[in-house]
Amino acid sequence: RDVAPSRGLGDVYKRQKFDCVIRDSYRMAGTGEERWHPSFCYHGFQYVEVVGFPGELTSDQIICCRLAVANEKHGTFETSNQTLNRICEITDRSISSNMYWSFTDCPQIEKLGWIETSHLMFASVADVYDIRAWMKKIIHDICDSQLDNEQASLAGNNEEGFVPGIIPAFYRIGGLYKDPNWNGACVFTPWAYYQYYGDEAVLRQAFPVIE
């Protein structure tokens, strides 16, 4: 089924967008209380469906661990309008759910390091979270991903100096491969960092890539 805005709360959507079946399997010993969690991956979701549980399952029997980088929260927003407050809360959850090794664009699909979010969402994130160290790391990764002459030759093209739209760039995705909103992050993100924090060192680090 397609995702429908009118879908009822609690309705689990199981369709695989890319026809990739992802499954965590755990065989219980059956000798007492057991706990398990994935060790090499994480999953984004809104609802969890449990099938085959013997007896009555209560919410306190399932623990959901929320994962994100440790960016300290220093900004808040609150009004007398509960709708605006709710929108702010939903937005904040969307932001924090994508703060990992890179700034991903969704926590439930491919979890790639799309770099356009690093500048398009910079102010929205920096107003609420201290992202100085985290964003420095992302800028370093963006600069480090630029193709040098040897890498361009190995790729069979003449794209020396090209900055991929995702980091690490292990494959290309259609028309986004050469879009300034994505590839231009090597310019826009360091500039946004400098404008917000006044750190010239970030500009000096990124300048050889920009040039």
Q: What function would you assign to each model-found segment?
A:
Residues 109-117, 130, 177-188, 205-208:
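Aromatic- and histidine-enriched alpha-helix N-cap/loop-to-helix transition segments
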Residues 53, 120-131, 186-202:
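Well-ordered alpha-helical scaffold segments within catalytic/enzyme domains
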